[in-house]
């Protein structure tokens, strides 16, 4: 007769879990050693003990969350922060999009420089860091050519794009991100001095303040450039976590969808970086969470307006769309001081004010910068591109649709990391399935019989998502894409994370009406956090694996 685990004493259950974690760690290490030839690079004992210890620590963390964190929001926040820490260290330095520029601007702010001076240089330690870890590391180390297959003697083309590790010949040394760490850590004994690094073409201050606080604390503790990077990442992650915790606490419905999006590897990858996307995504998630509240009081609309104004500091103009959802709140649900049009007007005015103030500040306190050329070169011209779009609307629609199709509608690129140069196939394939699972659990039977949010809220949020997605594509097409090009340059999956979150409640409503899931809301919320946390941990492991362990591309030159 099978033994039911629920009837076993808690100590026995956790003891079995510890044993299973140790066994899985040994098997995991064995897989790495066999499939990626890790024995030639690292001691088998170190790999085995490391994998087993890692899983035991994860199990201990899971026990502590289950034992001490009270409530859905608290459990979710702790899981977000702990899983984000894994991404902060699994992701090599400066490998988030534009993180090199973000690092330099954040570092300058952390030293008390709130202006922008192109003649100001950084310490040699920072220059060594940027030399060892170029942005888009995988692309920077990609090689292509024609070699000779030693087994057949035939010529064979090779291209290492998408591979962080490569090996020249069967017996050659494996080149990986570990070499960059070795290069940076050995800079004290090197004779050469790197070229000086000056301030980047980046003129924002407020979005980089959390990371700057982390860097300042790291410097006070005696850390160098690399330690400052991780200190900035951790405090940025803390800011992301706090915003997500507030969103989970304020959301009254569809909380499994929010937890799933917040714990997506792509969200944690950005949230644990030096990018201002950490706070930007947190504010997006918070505003959407507030739309699930039945009644809006002054505090609710105040938080929403503050988040709306902040996102317009980091990403101006397009984010003015976030003023409109205030009108999705019906009059009978509005209990704030002041009427909806006044709050919407105040939000719009505040957003425009901070946008114009940010632009003025970035110009007034900018020194010694030469003429700043357009990104993309002389072929990019916003005015000409806009005129081209207006003259050729059908061609523009075709370009938009073709770009979406070529990029798997960006829902199939939730595992594309680095500077879009490190694809992880497993996460690309399973990302949409995780979102579907989130929608299914969000479609659980509500605690109360009356349906809320209303169709007005859910449908309005979905419409906002589609308009926002089209606006993001149009903005990149006009400002970054050469005139008349049939593809949009610069679009990334991270731009659409808030879009998927806004669409999930609409999908949940559809699923509830078609398949009527029997699971209750309490059980759905209890299941989503551990499931998505495990997925996030696995995502962090895969990110580390692809940079440091394998797969290895063997080049026969």
Residue ranges and their predicted role:
Residues 269-271, 300-316, 320-327, 350:
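Membrane-interface alpha helices of multi-pass inner-membrane proteins
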Residues 290-299, 321-352:
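Perimembrane helix-loop-helix junctions
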Residues 113-229:
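Interfacial juxtamembrane loops and adjacent helix segments
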Residues 23-50, 353-354, 361-372, 518-557:
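Transmembrane helical bundles and short interhelical boundary loops of multi-pass, membrane-embedded
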Residues 359-446, 554:
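Membrane-lumen/periplasm interface segments of multi-pass, membrane-embedded glycan/lipid transferases
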Residues 13-17, 71, 223-226, 245-265:
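Transmembrane-helix signature of polytopic, membrane-embedded enzymes
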Residues 246, 279-296, 503-506:
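Specific aromatic-rich, kink-prone transmembrane helix
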Residues 60, 230-254:
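Transmembrane-helix motifs of polytopic, lipid-linked glycan transferases
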